């Protein structure tokens, strides 16, 4: 494994240098949580919610909602935040410093989990028996500013956000995310319509977790397609192009358009379907 890592980082660093030399910046993801079988948990069990024998006591997930009656049971180890705070968030600083050394911009997944997180007793079969716990909130943000400065981070802030989460994001100064596909739910478009975007944001037609925009067009309800066409003043067959243009024309400081959308590819080019196993992360150009 050491040899594989050596070759990987040698090749990756060469690729990054080439891309940067052409004016291309690389954006990478970092999940908020680690895997139960990760080296992170094995080497630092004291930083996670475990008993004295390396067994998890609480795990991560999402509460029940209209889309999942039992919630989502992710099963990741939860952090022992008081211990992290006592160490000045040293482990997190090292983790983020490494990420920013191999990427130019880092997107933190499930950013809201730093304000409060959903905790489920280990061994539960569903997420229904969980509860919310307070996270490190601004203490974590201040530690990241100290270690990294104030730029180079994208906060994945999708979904329901409490006033406390919004306040934490505002204090961080990190741009949040806007998804164009979410704007055209004719039942509830929320703050995803382009005219509502703040400048300090990153807009996507869709992410790796969404169907392609052409796939969205062909699978969305007639009401949603009609809503999008009215808003964008286009014909249904031109929706993908119009949504791309709306992203690029928005006031958001950054727009990210997946390659499959530039090529107008359908659902067969979807990268990932959350909470499923199977043919995920297999699409190739």
Question: What do the predicted segments below correspond to?
Answer:
Residues 1-11, 33-256, 260-262, 267, ...:
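Alpha-amylase-like alpha-glycosidases and glucanotransferases acting on alpha-linked glucans and related
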């Amino acid at each position: 494994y050491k040899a594989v890592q050596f070759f990987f980082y040698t090749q990756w660093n060469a690729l990054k240098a080439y891309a940067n030399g052409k004016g291309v910046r690389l954006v990478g993801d970092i999940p908020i949580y680690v895997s139960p079988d990760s080296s992170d948990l094995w080497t630092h069990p004291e930083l996670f919610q475990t008993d004295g024998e390396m067994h998890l006591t609480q795990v991560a997930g999402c509460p029940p909602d209209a889309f999942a009656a039992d919630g989502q049971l992710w099963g990741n180890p939860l952090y022992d935040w008081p211990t992290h705070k006592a160490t000045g968030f040293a482990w997190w600083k090292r983790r983020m410093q490494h990420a920013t050394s191999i990427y130019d911009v880092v997107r933190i997944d499930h950013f809201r989990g730093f304000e409060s997180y959903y905790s489920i007793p280990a061994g539960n079969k569903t997420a229904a028996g969980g509860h919310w716990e307070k996270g490190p909130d601004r203490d974590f943000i201040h530690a990241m500013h100290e270690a990294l400065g104030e730029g180079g981070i994208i906060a994945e802030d999708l979904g329901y956000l409490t006033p406390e989460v919004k306040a934490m994001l505002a204090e961080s100064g990190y741009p949040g995310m806007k998804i164009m596909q979410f704007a055209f739910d004719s039942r509830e478009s929320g703050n995803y319509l382009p005219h509502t975007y703040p400048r300090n944001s990153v807009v996507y037609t869709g992410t790796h977790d969404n169907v392609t925009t052409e796939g969205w067009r062909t699978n969305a309800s007639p009401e949603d397609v009609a809503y999008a066409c009215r808003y964008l003043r286009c014909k249904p067959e031109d929706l993908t192009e119009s949504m791309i243009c709306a992203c690029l024309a928005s006031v958001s400081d950054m727009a990210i358009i997946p390659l499959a959308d530039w090529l107008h590819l359908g659902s067969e080019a979807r990268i990932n379907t959350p909470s499923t196993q199977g043919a995920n992360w297999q699409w190739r150009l």
